[in-house]
């Protein structure tokens, strides 16, 4: 696995090609086999997703590799599951800022089984009550901070500084590789 971060801000279009070139050069120069390419398939910035998916498809097509698409919200769950001690009945609610008071969010259990599908939500004090009334719910991702003032239920917990980094894709991509759940690079 190759991972590199740039925390300077949204420069996806500028940096991605350079990062990919470095990764492929490293793999090639060290004789390492490349088994597949994993890419985030959203939700998120439409332009950013198009750039990332196009780059991934190009690599897969050129090297005859399978493509693995992973939901960004599931990727956000990985560091929470790895680095936070959650109760058995905890639910995870990753959130991505969708501007204004809207977030892209889903609800998962600790096994990443979907409890509520991905949706664009306008958050208010009644949001997620069907889950909060029954379980501790952990909110995280860049959309969670703006919801802190609206979601005040005692079962609501907020985790800061969770970002969708490439390194968090690995355990999910590995599962998809075993299942041979690949995306079509032609479309």
Predicted features along the sequence, with ranges:
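N-terminal beta-alpha supersecondary unit
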Residues: 1-43
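Stable alpha-helical structural segments in soluble proteins, enriched in small hydrophobic residues
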Residues: 23-27, 62, 80, 169-177
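Residues at secondary-structure transition points
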Residues: 7-18, 46, 50, 54, ...
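Acyltransferase
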Residues: 115, 157-187
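DPxDG-like acidic metal-binding loop motif
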Residues: 38-72
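Surface "functional belts" at beta-alpha junctions
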Residues: 11, 66-164
């Amino acid at each position: 696995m190759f991972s590199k971060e740039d925390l300077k801000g949204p420069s996806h279009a500028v940096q991605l090609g350079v990062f990919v070139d470095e990764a492929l050069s490293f793999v090639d120069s060290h004789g390492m086999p490349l088994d597949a390419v994993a890419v985030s398939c959203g939700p998120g910035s439409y332009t950013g997703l198009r750039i990332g998916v196009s780059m991934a498809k190009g690599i897969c097509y050129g090297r005859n590799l399978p493509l693995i698409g992973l939901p960004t919200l599931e990727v956000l769950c990985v560091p929470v599951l790895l680095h936070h001690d959650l109760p058995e009945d905890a639910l995870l609610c990753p959130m991505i800022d969708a501007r204004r008071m809207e977030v892209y969010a889903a609800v998962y259990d600790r096994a990443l089984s979907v409890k509520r599908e991905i949706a664009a939500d306008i958050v208010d004090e009644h949001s997620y009550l069907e889950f909060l009334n029954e379980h501790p719910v952990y909110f995280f991702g860049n959309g969670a901070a703006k919801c802190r003032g609206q979601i005040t239920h005692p079962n609501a917990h907020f985790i800061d500084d969770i970002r969708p980094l490439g390194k968090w894709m690995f355990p999910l991509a590995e599962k998809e590789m075993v299942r041979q759940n690949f995306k079509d690079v032609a479309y």
